[in-house]
Amino acid sequence: MSAEPLLPTHNGSQGGEVRSPDQKFIVIRFSDVSVRDLQLNISNVPFSNINTHWLRRMCRELRPQQTQKRRLKFIRNGSILNTHSKIAEELTHYFDTANNSNVATGTSVAPEQNNYYIHCIIGTEELTQAELANEDLKDDATPSNDSMTTQAIGFDRLRSVGFTEQEIELLRQQFRATYGDLEEEEERLAQNGNRDDEGHDIRQLEEQWMESGSGTAQGNGAGGGNEDRFNSVPIANIKHNKDLLLGICVGFFFGVFGILLMKFDGLFNRRQKMAIFAGVIVNVMFCLVRGF
């Protein structure tokens, strides 16, 4: 974990310190994958003080280089957050549900269960001081999720609440990067001439993510185990690693013949082809080293 203070008044876990099971965190996951996740220790922070204004202040204090003067929009499981969002109630419900579930099963609290994930979209335009001062009002001026157009599905719905094309594309890239098999399925169906159907299927997955937050604050908590299934999946999907390993091995052991295999449609996906090319380069380098 980063050695920087998670809050101005509280120092988070340092170096090899063991994280206490009682500690609670808000994890800000940015749409720009080059910006690492921001963990905010809220163990000693009253939930009533946590709102979008507080989240923006924390982001700009702890990630100033990437967020200063940028428009910041927050999403929780597809729900756009504003000053009217009941973040305090959701935090209480989330952590109470996790705690009650562990008490019922007699298990200890896993570190991941104490993480409450919020997505942050970093805007591309720079805001003036006046616009920064009225940023919360801009959130309130956007339509609610219930008033979004029903014709568009998935992340395309965000256009109706003021998101730019670039911001939507950043969010979509992060979503697809998390699930590497989506890219593979896209290529497979595109080769079969079913690209339009596949695009609709992926939009449906995006729609499921957009709507997944609507029922998590209700009921008896039976769905608590799946509440963060989209958020807690690591960005580096294991399927990516398998494709890279397969491609590098094919390129290294088959050499130039591996490039010929790339000509067969449907045999390798795009990620595997890139890895094959890298494997061929490694093969050539070994040949040069042995030659000398």
Swiss-Prot record:
Compartment list: Endoplasmic reticulum membrane
Residues listed as glycosylation sites in the UniProt record: 11, 41, 77, 99, 145
Any GO CC annotation of this UniProt entry: Dsc E3 ubiquitin ligase complex
Keyword Zinc annotated: no
Spans within the Cytoplasmic topological domain: 265-273
Any one biological process term the GO annotation gives: endocytosis
One Pfam assignment: Dsc3_C
Extracellular side: 1-243, 292
Bilayer topology term: Multi-pass membrane protein
Keyword Metal-binding: no
Transmembrane segments annotated in the record for this chain: 244-264, 274-291
UniProt function note: Component of the DSC E3 ubiquitin ligase complexes that tag proteins present in Golgi, endosome and vacuole membranes and function in protein homeostasis under non-stress conditions and support a role in protein quality control. Involved in endocytic protein trafficking.
Protein name listed in UniProt: DSC E3 ubiquitin ligase complex subunit 3
